[in-house]
Amino acid sequence: IGGGPAGSTVARYAAEGGLSVLVVDGRDPVGTPLQCGELVPTNEEMKSLCPDVPEVDDLFRTPDEAISSKSDKMRIVKPNGKGMDFKFGGMVLDRVAHDEALVDLAASSGAKFLLGSKVKRVDDESVHLSDGTVLKGKVIVGAGGYNDPIRKKHWSEESLNIPVKFVLKEGQHS
């Protein structure tokens, strides 16, 4: 459920592994309207942030035409208005083009897409669509983001509210 970056990537890997894959997404086309998140780390930055993740270049495929710009630093502006710069290899994506490219990769690997179809609920191995259609699957992946029906069924709102606190401090730290 969900054909965004996570759903399309899971679909590609599952299809490449020989599984029969159907991605259901309420949007048509996938990626519209824009949801969020256009700044992402480059693959080189991901390798330094997550050194134990194998095959980063295969996992995160971003075609050149989906990259709006690149940067080598990030700036955080503190409440007092003073900025702090730090090294960070990043890319600003054209998210619609990026999502379309990931859908194309998954489809070229054999995944099928059912777009413009809303999931009403999921019961065990059954996915119930809002038009009354019932789909069966041995494995159902919830990649629909915050509004995903599997997320709603298994995780409460309170469990997702993770307080994040941090302190910005200038200087060299190791």
Map each language-model feature to its residues.
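Short beta-strand to alpha-helix junction loop
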Residues: 84-105
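Short, hydrophobic alpha-helix immediately C-terminal to the catalytic nucleophile
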Residues: 8-12
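Beta1/beta-strand and adjacent pyrophosphate-binding region of the FAD-binding site
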Residues: 1-6, 22
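Short beta-strand "acidic-cap" motif of Rossmann-like dinucleotide-binding folds
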Residues: 19-25
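N-terminal FAD cofactor-binding segment of flavoenzymes
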Residues: 13, 26-74
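Predominantly flavin-linked oxidoreductase catalytic cores and closely associated redox partners
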Residues: 3, 13, 17, 29, ...
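Short polybasic amphipathic segments
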Residues: 72-78, 125-128
